[in-house]
């Protein structure tokens, strides 16, 4: 059964219950898009829907990438699920889910995302400024 909270979903990604169909394109978002997604989430803005397919049939899939390194080509290991495994395949929302997974549980180019949610406006920057370090 899918857990519909953010961290429940991220844990299911980490535990290989929510996976990407083999035909999905690679992750392409840059760190500014990831930061803007997190900023929207923190401000309570809608960030779009995710479409999952709960399949009991054998499917070819790949796991989410937790640590993104844009300096090397992305290489994927394609796996096959057993019939009845009940995997959830992401049909729409891969870029957003990967971004959330990287932001909260992984790294982007060997850096961890930090969000400045306590300071006020400084140098024309929006409060809640974000950066990778």
Regions found by a protein language model. Name each.
Residues 1-133:
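Basic- and aromatic-enriched surface patches that contact anionic nucleotides/nucleic acids
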